[in-house]
Amino acid sequence: AKTVFVLPNNKNIIMAAEQAIPLAKDRQVRVLQTKTIPQGISAMLVFDETQSADDNQMAMMDAAAHVETGSVTFAARDSELDGRPIKQGEIMGMCGSKIKFLGDDIVDIAFKTVDKLFKRGEHALVTLIYGADATEEQAQALENRLSEKYGSDMEISIVDGGQPIYYFLLSVE
């Protein structure tokens, strides 16, 4: 390939990726500033090999910009948020990088997180990417709850991502 697109999918990696560009002497490297895995996936899905690098870059960044990302993970240690104690192992629902929900039920926290991110009329597609420590049954239970609430306003896809640390990565477009 004459042009390589790098999708860091993490805000902490973008600068390092950009600094590595001069090391690629035999091809053009473009770092697209994707900050989350769902943004990167959305960007990849619109790539069209028949288009120019500039057109692809614009389309990919536009796709990434329209993705709201949520995640469901666990507290690695005891801490505190806004005066509320968080216990090690407690389930956390995050909208972007902000902790919004705490609890002990993975599906409930994931439902609340998607519910917070999803806006009728603005969004239509939700992708539930379940990780190594979540089950397909949990993903289906989440899909059922979301379908009950949103019906045909929300198209839902379930993907076995197998990722560590995150029970769910949630993409809202």
Per-segment meaning from a language model:
Residues 1-173:
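N-terminal loops that bind phosphate or other acidic moieties
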